[in-house]
């Protein structure tokens, strides 16, 4: 067509040439508009197909039967035995995954993407913790045990296969608050080059039936995906207390969550790249089922630091600070009998604030002694409040 316009343009007057140019531009504009309308038509056709297609039924795979059929639990209620559509890769069909059934509920038409619970997503996940054993004072024996039962199986599982024994599946750390249980777990994750997943057990306690158990299940699935990994369950007594026969619906839900945790502990290989560490300061109320062989096999006490331990902890914190030369670590350790590692850290921080308030850039021995007295007053108040609560509870 453009050739015809060229012939007309050569044999025509200037006005006619201008008209031809306008017509050419109009044709180009119309061609673009036709293409846009074609795209819009295809879009609406696709939308109409979606609207007219029958809805699918969501279901969860329970088991794959020997004859190739699948047992599923449908969202509408009953368990069904269904077939797999020919276009579905049968290797993708595994227990626990979500699938879409046709409206009659007889065939799996689609494998749905796996969803991760928002609570699991928000758990503290540290790809590579930066805590080392050298930052922990007074816990040499506890570090040795953790290295043997957590770090060694993660780094050298073949040693256990050769000798024919299985390492412990889980480790339980117990002791007063602030004694370094979380730091121990982070340090062993650092040395093992493992992802550290920190969860407080109370996060498992949900108000809807089955929610807590599902979160536990998804937590272990995430840990397997991120392996090598260490799951650290803090305050496990929140869901692991001794079970009672009669309780509220909330207590029954916590018991279901505990049962799911026990099932997960029973269900994984101790030589896998996932290790479980739990911590509590109330080991006396834990359910015996948690402590039986095959679950939390190794129980490690993390006590308040002794004189030597307190000296080491003071040295760890003070060597990072600007201090005067006359600091007497032994005297500081004597003055802090009964202090936890967290208390000693608070002493060092409080002493630094005293120096800052006075406009000094170094911490003195007097600052540290005053800080010890201040922390002692706070500790005594907390103890007094605790005693009153126990008296009137």
Swiss-Prot record:
One of its GO terms (cellular component) is proteasome-activating nucleotidase complex. One of its GO terms (biological process) is protein unfolding. It comes from the Archaea. Keywords: ATP-binding, Chaperone, Coiled coil, Cytoplasm, Nucleotide-binding, Proteasome. SMART domains: AAA. Its main location: cytoplasm. ATP binds at residues 178-183, 317. GO terms for molecular function: ATP binding; ATP hydrolysis activity; proteasome-activating activity. It holds the Pfam family Prot_ATP_ID_OB_C. Residues 15-53, 365-393 form a coiled coil. The keyword Magnesium does not apply. Residues 391-393 are annotated as: Docks into pockets in the proteasome alpha-ring to cause gate opening. It is found in: Cytoplasm. The keyword Lyase does not apply. Consists of three main regions, an N-terminal coiled-coil domain that may assist in substrate recognition, an interdomain involved in PAN hexamerization, and a C-terminal ATPase domain of the AAA type. Belongs to the AAA ATPase family. ATPase which is responsible for recognizing, binding, unfolding and translocation of substrate proteins into the archaeal 20S proteasome core particle. Is essential for opening the gate of the 20S proteasome via an interaction with its C-terminus, thereby allowing substrate entry and access to the site of proteolysis. Thus, the C-termini of the proteasomal ATPase function like a 'key in a lock' to induce gate opening and therefore regulate proteolysis. PANTHER family: 26S PROTEASOME REGULATORY SUBUNIT (PTHR23073). Homohexamer. The hexameric complex has a two-ring architecture resembling a top hat that caps the 20S proteasome core at one or both ends. Upon ATP-binding, the C-terminus of PAN interacts with the alpha-rings of the proteasome core by binding to the intersubunit pockets. This is Proteasome-activating nucleotidase.
């Amino acid at each position: 067509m453009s050739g015809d316009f060229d012939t007309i343009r050569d044999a025509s007057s200037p006005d006619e040439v201008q008209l031809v140019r306008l017509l050419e531009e109009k044709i180009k504009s119309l061609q673009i508009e036709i293409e846009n309308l074609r795209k819009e038509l295809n879009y609406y056709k696709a939308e109409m197909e979606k609207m007219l297609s029958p809805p699918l039924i969501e279901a969860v795979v329970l088991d794959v039967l020997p004859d190739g059929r699948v047992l599923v639990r449908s969202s509408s209620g009953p368990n069904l035995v269904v077939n797999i559509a020919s276009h579905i890769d049968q290797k993708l069909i595994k227990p626990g995954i979500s699938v879409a059934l046709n409206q009659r509920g007889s065939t799996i038409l689609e494998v749905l993407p796996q969803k991760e619970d928002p609570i699991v997503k928000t758990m503290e996940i540290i790809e590579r913790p930066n805590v080392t054993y050298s930052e922990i004072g007074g816990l040499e024996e506890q570090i040795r045990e953790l290295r043997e039962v957590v770090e060694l199986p993660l780094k050298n599982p073949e040693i256990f296969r050769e000798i024919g024994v299985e390492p412990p599946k889980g480790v339980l750390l117990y002791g007063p608050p602030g004694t370094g249980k979380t730091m121990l777990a982070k340090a062993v994750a650092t040395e093992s080059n493992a992802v550290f997943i920190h969860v407080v057990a109370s996060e498992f306690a949900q108000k809807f039936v089955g929610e807590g158990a599902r979160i536990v299940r998804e937590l272990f699935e995430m840990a397997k995906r991120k392996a090598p990994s260490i799951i650290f369950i803090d305050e496990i007594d929140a869901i692991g207390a001794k079970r009672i026969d009669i309780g509220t619906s909330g207590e029954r839900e916590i018991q279901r969550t505990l049962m799911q945790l026990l099932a997960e502990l029973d269900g994984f290989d101790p030589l896998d790249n996932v290790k479980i560490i739990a911590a509590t300061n109330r080991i006396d109320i834990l359910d015996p089922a948690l402590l039986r062989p095959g679950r939390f096999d190794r129980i490690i006490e993390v006590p308040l630091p002794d004189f030597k331990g307190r000296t080491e902890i003071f040295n760890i914190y003070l060597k990072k600070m600007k201090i005067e030369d006359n600091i007497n670590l032994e005297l500081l350790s004597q003055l802090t009998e009964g202090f936890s590692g967290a208390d000693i850290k608070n002493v060092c921080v409080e002493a630094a604030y005293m120096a800052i308030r006075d406009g000094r850039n170094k911490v003195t021995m007097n600052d540290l002694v005053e800080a010890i007295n201040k922390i002692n007053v706070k500790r005594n108040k907390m103890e007094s409040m605790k005693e009153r609560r126990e008296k009137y509870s």
